[in-house]
């Protein structure tokens, strides 16, 4: 369809119709019943026995012999081309034209200027005489090497190949190089000194330094003119007196003339005495520490034995220790006989192992009440306290190990309505 928009030479108008393939007769016979002729195919005297209205698609610009791009007065059109529809032809109307295809249009001449092939643009086909020959398609690389604008010569309007101008004899321009550009003058101003970026940075730095010096001098002058905020301000700051303290003194000075208030000197003296005087609680604590220090001396009876009492649950133990060969008796029995379990015997000897005096003491104790576990705990606490009374320096190690702490855990009492202290009876719903 686009081919109708371009102008063609008169001698090439019917070439397209001749070279195009003829449509099949099946299509034309299929369209024939659509004719509006009521004569049923009768002749009209043009020699082919067919009416003009039998043409299924009768376009004014294509089939009309008086107007359109195919109407012409030259000898070629009147010579009688088959299918032209003119009186000088064979009397047959042109068959249905083939649909437009972009691939076929690209193979044809896009711009037809009077029958000559456009210069500078290669087409897929070129007419030479009466034969059609295949030509090479246009290549971008080869097109760059050829003349872009021009007919058949090497020069067109003074421009040569590769953009050189030969009429004015200009030299081919060299590609831009950064190294050569840095060595030369970037902006040639007729002998003037070129503008340097480094010089501008140095000037900006100098201006900044000058500005800082001016601001510093102004600040020093303002400090000298205004002076400190308060008289002897530096001395007050160094002495540690804060603004809150000064405000409190000023407030007390304001109440100096009020009746019923003591003078300011008496108030200051009372405050000074209260701060320097020791409190009664501190005195009590100091007295207790002195008493404890006096009590940390060896405490032995008339026989030279240290005594200690221990309690655990319901058991009460009384322990006497003295330097000896390592004998250990519980209720007039050897402790390994009284406590057959190895864990109980090891628990009794732990205070001695902690003080590193195992085997250096003769221990005699009596215990009553409670069970085996309670009696073991009571004897252990009694031994620890007896060691402390014999040698007060052992208190630190025994205290750190926890042997001087009384275990206050006892059996919890039974509650009413329960089987034991916390155990409940079996609950029955009904």
From Swiss-Prot:
SUPFAM superfamilies: Ribosomal protein S5 domain 2-like. PROSITE patterns: RIBOSOMAL_S9 (PS00360). Residues 1-34 form a transit peptide. It comes from the Eukaryota. Its main location: mitochondrion. InterPro entries: Ribosomal_Su5_D2-typ_SF, Ribosomal_uS9, Ribosomal_uS9_bac/plastid, Ribosomal_uS9_CS, Ribsml_uS5_D2-typ_fold_subgr. Pfam families: Ribosomal_S9. Residues 39-48, 80-91 have a biased composition (Gly residues). GO terms for biological process: embryo sac central cell differentiation; gametophyte development; pollen development; translation. Keywords: Mitochondrion, Ribonucleoprotein, Ribosomal protein, Transit peptide. Residues 68-79 have a biased composition (Low complexity). The keyword Transit peptide applies. Expressed in root tips, young leaves, flowers and siliques. One of its GO terms (molecular function) is structural constituent of ribosome. Mitochondrial ribosomal protein required for central cell maturation. May work together with PIA2 in controlling female gametophyte development, possibly by regulating the expression of some mitochondrial proteins. Interacts (via C terminus) with PIA2. Component of the mitochondrial ribosome small subunit. This is Small ribosomal subunit protein uS9m. It comes from Arabidopsis thaliana (Mouse-ear cress). The gene is RPS9M.
């Amino acid at each position: 369809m686009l081919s109708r928009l371009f102008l063609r030479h008169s001698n090439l108008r019917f070439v397209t119709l001749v070279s195009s393939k003829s449509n099949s007769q099946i299509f034309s016979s299929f369209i024939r019943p659509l004719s509006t002729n009521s004569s049923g195919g009768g002749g009209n005297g043009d020699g082919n026995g067919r009416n003009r209205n039998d043409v299924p698609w009768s376009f004014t610009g294509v089939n009309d012999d008086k107007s359109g791009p195919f109407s012409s007065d030259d000898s070629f059109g009147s010579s009688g081309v088959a299918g032209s529809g003119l009186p000088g032809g064979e009397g047959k109307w042109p068959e249905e034209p083939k649909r437009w295809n972009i691939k076929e249009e690209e193979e044809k001449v896009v711009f037809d200027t009077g029958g000559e092939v456009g210069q500078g643009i290669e087409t897929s086909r070129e007419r030479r005489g009466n034969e059609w020959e295949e030509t090479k398609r246009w290549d971008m690389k080869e097109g760059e090497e050829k003349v872009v604008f021009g007919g058949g010569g090497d020069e067109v309007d003074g421009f040569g190949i590769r953009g050189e101008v030969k009429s004015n004899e200009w030299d081919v321009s060299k590609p831009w190089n950064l190294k050569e550009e840095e060595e030369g003058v970037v902006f040639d101003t007729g002998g003037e000194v070129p503008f340097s970026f480094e010089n501008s940075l140095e000037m900006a730095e100098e201006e900044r330094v000058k500005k800082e010096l001016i601001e510093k001098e102004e600040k020093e002058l303002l400090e000298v003119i205004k002076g400190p905020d308060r008289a002897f301000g530096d001395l007050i700051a160094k002495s540690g007196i804060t603004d809150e303290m000064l405000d409190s003194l000023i407030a007390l000075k304001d109440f100096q003339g009020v009746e019923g208030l003591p003078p300011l000197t008496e108030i200051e003296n009372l405050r000074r005495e209260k701060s320097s005087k020791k409190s009664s609680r501190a005195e009590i604590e100091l007295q207790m520490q002195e008493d404890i220090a006096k009590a940390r001396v060896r405490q032995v009876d008339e026989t030279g034995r240290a005594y200690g009492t221990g309690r655990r649950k319901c058991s009460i133990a009384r322990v006497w220790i003295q330097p000896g060969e390592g004998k250990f008796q519980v209720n007039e029995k050897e402790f390994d006989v009284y406590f057959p379990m190895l864990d109980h015997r090891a628990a009794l000897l732990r205070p001695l192992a902690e003080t590193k005096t195992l085997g250096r003491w003769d221990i005699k104790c009596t215990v009553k009440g409670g069970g085996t576990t309670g009696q073991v705990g009571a004897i252990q606490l009694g031994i620890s306290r007896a060691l402390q009374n014999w040698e007060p320096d052992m208190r630190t190690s025994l205290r750190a190990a926890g042997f001087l702490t009384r275990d206050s855990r006892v059996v919890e009492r039974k509650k009413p309505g329960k089987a034991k202290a916390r155990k409940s009876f079996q609950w029955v719903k009904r």
